[in-house]
UniProtKB/Swiss-Prot annotation:
Protein's name in the database: Leucine-rich repeat and calponin homology domain-containing protein 4
SMART domains reported for this sequence: CH (SM00033), LRR_BAC (SM00364), LRR_TYP (SM00369)
LRR repeats: 41-64, 67-90, 92-113, 114-136, 138-158, 159-181, 182-204, 206-226, 227-250
Segments traversing the membrane: 653-673
Biased composition, class Low complexity, residue ranges: 1-18, 461-481, 511-524
Modified residues (Phosphoserine): S279, S281, S304, S307, S309, S313, S432, S457, S511, S513, S517, S521, S589
A GO CC annotation given for this chain: plasma membrane
Gene3D superfamilies found in the cross-reference section: Calponin-like domain, Ribonuclease Inhibitor
UniProt keyword Transmembrane helix, yes or no: yes
Residue spans of biased composition, Polar residues class: 449-460
Recorded superkingdom: Eukaryota
Gene name in the database record: LRCH4
InterPro entries hit by this protein: CH_dom, CH_dom_sf, Leu-rich_rpt, Leu-rich_rpt_typical-subtyp, LRR_dom_sf, LRR_domain-containing
Length: 683
């Protein structure tokens, strides 16, 4: 009899002993241990039947014990072929562990557990998750080490789920419905057969992500929005983007690489894109934690300026392409005058392209502020009638567009045609936008400014203005007190003191002021002169490339404008001209080959400061935005620095015709003398 009882104990465990043994046999302690566990469950609310090799739930437990108050049930390490029916009747159950059993399917009665928040089904033989599992208020779902081939589409209905572990399964893809898990913090898909990760994962507030030991070759760019991510595990994957050397450096380098890719992909849409794609905009913390103040404790440290602060400023690398700057540039360019629109439409059939960077550069705002301060009382918006302020604001976007290098030739031809048709130097172009009392003032200022531009010497005009101001020249009366006659094409404007001359906000004036040819006499203002030929930006770029390659002793990239925009080459040039003039240079790393806009601007500002220390006049310097955008004025500043400090003057951009003829004559004469000398020696 004892041998007959020992065999069931070895084969079937304690449950077999409890059901086949008789009182007094060795199986009695197993029954007593199960009964003791049930008694403790009634007293404590926690049922622990783990590691007992049970195939069935203890019989008669529901009739003998009141288990309605059980909140935690541990049925792990047993041999249940399915979820016990008695466990599905525990309506107060909040946590259920069926770890390491023999489950092949789940009982539909699990849907009765309306208070269940924790469910552990790992180390079983499940091949699918039924839909009724997704109707439970689960916060933790663990189904690792099973045979799941796919997740159900209803997985997105688990809105309160915070941890999902589906590791060590046979998943080949993840459903896009995962984006519905708005509370998910921990996602573990380790040891599956995943080849791609859905883009929607970037919208989740994940803190921990593990997709190691899969077949993933590319991390989605949208993952750069996972700003709360603390841990990311991606080993044992054939990753190609980001490269392996980037992934080995850690989480910060991975996210910087993804942020750079996102910026390049956003800028590749072109200026005609209506706005930046919403998939690259960082989600605010208030959307993830409504009603709570977010203190940055879960940030990843990406793009942090201070190494001690683990704060990811996700907007810092995308300020220039944000939707706010796009709307500002749109509002600044909409209220343009009808004549301006007509000229744009007749001269160029292409639509007006939007320049995100040019519309919101701090350097341009500072330059515009200095021009406003130097404006005389007649032309300032606050001195006379307040209604003239909108008109002056309408004309500013046109001046911004004229400074673009690609429209230089177009605006040159347009200015020349208008001046030839007007019959007088500097006839105003936008008379229809101004009041009659202001037309003569603007016309006179434009006339004197245009004549000063023809002289090719804005510096002399400024010096004359300063001299006149120092001698106490009388200031003209405000335009609002006495209306002036309208300036026509045949009437020349009355002479005005040079101290009140206003610099026009014109690209042609800036170009001519950069290539001034010397001081001009007072009577030269009334004498028309031939236009100086404005140097082409391509010629400037070619000459600057030759100078930089000869100075730095190394070849430069093909796209020199983009290389100069980072400011690294300019700072190296300054240090080559005068050692230690730029003490600190921001250089790109192999992982992130492109500098951020903030670091590039700091390099450019350091170069301009070094130029000031080397003796380059302030009038020959440009704003940081000119160097960042690669305009002709910025290129000329770099050449001027080499010219001032390099010890020898640069070759001129266009040699004078008289000098060229003399050079040709001299070369021909030397050749004739050489031929004559050789013939004399031969004879």
């Amino acid at each position: 009899m004892a041998a007959a009882v020992a065999a069931p104990l070895a084969a079937g465990g304690e449950e077999a002993a409890a059901t086949t043994s008789v009182p007094g046999s060795p199986g009695l302690p197993g029954r007593r241990s199960a009964e003791r566990a049930l008694e403790e469950a009634v007293a404590t609310g926690t049922l622990n039947l783990s590691n007992r090799r049970l195939k069935h739930f203890p019989r008669g437990a529901a009739r003998s014990y009141d288990l309605s108050d059980i909140t935690q049930a541990d049925l792990s390490r047993n041999r249940f072929p399915e979820v016990p029916e008695a466990a599905c009747q525990l309506v107060s159950l909040e946590g259920l562990s069926l770890y390491h059993n023999c489950l092949r399917c789940l009982n539909p009665a699990l849907g009765n557990l309306t208070a269940l928040t924790y469910l552990n089904l790992s180390r079983n033989q499940l091949s699918l998750l039924p839909p009724y599992i997704c109707q439970l208020p689960l916060r933790v779902l663990i189904v690792s080490n099973n045979k799941l081939g796919a997740l159900p589409p209803d997985i997105g209905t688990l809105g309160s789920l915070r941890q999902l572990d589906v590791s060590s399964n046979e998943l080949q893809s993840l459903p896009s419905e995962l984006c519905g898990l708005s509370s998910l913090r921990d996602l573990n898909v380790r040891r599956n057969q995943l080849s791609t990760l859905p883009e929607e994962l970037g919208d989740l507030p994940l803190v921990r992500l593990d997709f190691s030991c899969n077949r993933v070759s590319r991390i989605p760019v949208s993952f750069c929005r996972l700003r709360h991510l603390q841990v990311i595990l991606l080993d044992s994957n054939p990753l190609q983007s980001p490269p392996a050397q980037v992934c080995l450096k850690g989480k910060l380098h991975i996210f910087k690489y993804l942020s750079t890719e996102a910026g390049q992909r956003g800028s590749a849409l072109g200026d005609l894109a209506p706005s930046r794609p919403p998939s690259f905009s960082p989600c605010p913390a208030e959307d993830l934690f409504p009603g709570h103040r977010y203190d940055g404790g879960l940030d990843s440290g990406f793009h942090s300026v201070d190494s001690g602060s683990k704060r990811w400023s996700g907007n810092e690398s995308t300020d220039e392409f944000s939707e706010l700057s796009f709307r500002i540039s749109e509002l600044a360019r909409e209220p343009r005058g009808p004549r301006e629109r007509k000229e744009d439409g007749s001269a160029d059939g292409d639509p007006v392209q939007i320049d995100f960077i040019d519309s919101h550069v701090p350097g341009e705002d500072e330059e515009r502020g200095t021009v406003e301060e130097q404006r005389p009382p007649e032309l300032s918006p606050g001195a006379g009638d307040r209604e003239r302020a909108p008109s002056s604001r309408r004309e500013e976007p046109a001046g911004e567009e004229r400074r673009r290098p690609d429209t230089l030739q177009l605006w040159q031809e347009r200015e020349r045609r208008q001046q030839q048709q007007s019959g007088a130097w500097g006839a105003p172009r936008k008379d229809s936008l101004l009041k009659p009392g202001l037309r003569a003032v603007v016309g006179g200022a434009a006339a004197v400014s245009t004549q000063a531009m023809h002289n090719g010497s804005p510096k002399s005009s400024a010096s004359q203005a300063g001299a006149a101001a120092g001698q106490g020249a009388p200031a003209p009366a405000p335009a609002s007190q006495e209306p002036l006659p309208i300036a026509g094409p045949a009437t020349a404007p009355a002479p005005r003191p040079l101290g009140s001359i206003q610099r026009p906000n014109s690209f042609l004036f800036r170009s001519s002021s950069q290539s001034g040819s010397g001081p001009s006499s007072p009577d030269s203002v009334l004498r028309p002169r031939r236009y100086p030929q404005v140097p082409d930006e391509k010629d400037l770029m070619t000459q600057l490339r030759q100078v930089l390659e000869s100075r730095l002793q190394r070849p430069l990239p093909e796209d020199l404008a983009e290389a100069l925009a980072s400011g690294v080459i300019l700072c190296q040039l300054a240090n080559q001209l005068r050692p230690r003039s730029v003490p600190f240079i921001h250089v790109p790393s192999p992982a992130v080959p492109k500098l951020s806009a903030l670091k590039a601007r700091k390099n450019v500002e350091s170069f301009l400061e070094a130029c000031r220390k080397m003796g380059v006049p302030e009038a020959d310097l440009c704003s940081p935005s000119d160097l960042l955008q690669g305009t002709a004025r910025g290129l000329r500043t770099a050449l001027e620095a080499v010219k001032r400090v390099g010890g020898k003057a640069l070759p001129p951009l266009w040699p004078p015709s008289g000098l060229g003829g003399f050079v040709v004559f001299y070369v021909v004469l030397m050749l004739l003398l050489y031929v004559t000398y050789t013939r004399l020696l031969g004879s």
